[in-house]
Amino acid sequence: MSKISEVFKNSKALITYVTAGDPNLEVTKEIILELNKDGVDIIEVGIPFSDPLADGPIIQKASQKALKNGVTLKKIFETLNEIKEEVTCPLVLMGYYNSILNYGIDNFITEAVNTGISGVIIPDLPFDEEEEFYAKIKENGIDPILLVAPNTSEERLKEISKVCSGFLYCVSIMGVTGDSQAPMEHLKEYSQRVRKYVNIPLAIGFGIDSPTKAKNIIEYFDGIIVGSALIKIIDENSDDKGKLLKEIKRFTKSLKVW
């Protein structure tokens, strides 16, 4: 059983997303350690990219800031290596395929294994476009985590279930991340439909920004993914590290509503 699968064995999961290098890599280290200490179950570490198609304005801004700081995939691996012994929860790398191609697929997999990465999410790489890549990371003990949306067909769900492991990333709306105005009424039906074809845990993301929303949603899913709301806190408090870490603690603790 993978480290990610272990998380879901006895409990629901709180999954958070941070952009590596926002506001800088030193602070990213401290944010990850704080999230780990505060009981976050899985941490997604975003690889900044110049044209992040699935990301809303908040995460786009964080990406731009990180790129301006000279953040590269190599530096991200170096940073995560420095804290890998202290982080007890699974780390998942999330990024666009171009970043990985530029780094070199074999190099990426080697570094991911050495850094103790548990899973990989690539929003712009459908499972049927690069089957070899997903097979390779799986062979190396890394979970390929795929995305589905409310309009994903039954046929596609069946195929995705053969490739995906760890958890399935269920996008709650059609659009970009951070849309907290998305209607939530369809989520029960959505989770029931996906569960007919997929037998791994379902985590829901896009638009979760409050304990109330988390409570309403977690009933139907195995985990919640919080990204833009956390990135906003980082952006608003990046000048005061002490306050930033306190705010992260307050916010993440408030989201564990189960």
From Swiss-Prot:
Record pathway: Amino-acid biosynthesis; L-tryptophan biosynthesis; L-tryptophan from chorismate: step 5/5
EC code(s) of this entry: 4.2.1.20
CDD domains registered for this protein in UniProt: Tryptophan_synthase_alpha (cd04724)
GO cellular component: cytosol
Catalytic residues (UniProt): 44, 55
Statement: the UniProt record of this protein carries the keyword Lyase: yes
Keyword tags: Amino-acid biosynthesis, Aromatic amino acid biosynthesis, Lyase, Tryptophan biosynthesis
Molecular function GO labels: tryptophan synthase activity
Cross-referenced SUPFAM superfamilies: Ribulose-phoshate binding barrel (SSF51366)
Enzyme class: lyase
A UniProt-annotated Pfam family: Trp_syntA
Entry keyword annotation includes Amino-acid biosynthesis: yes
Catalytic reaction equation(s): (1S,2R)-1-C-(indol-3-yl)glycerol 3-phosphate + L-serine = D-glyceraldehyde 3-phosphate + L-tryptophan + H2O
Cited Gene3D superfamilies: Aldolase class I
Assembly behavior: Tetramer of two alpha and two beta chains.
Family in the record: Belongs to the TrpA family.
Function per UniProt: The alpha subunit is responsible for the aldol cleavage of indoleglycerol phosphate to indole and glyceraldehyde 3-phosphate.
Protein name from the UniProt record: Tryptophan synthase alpha chain
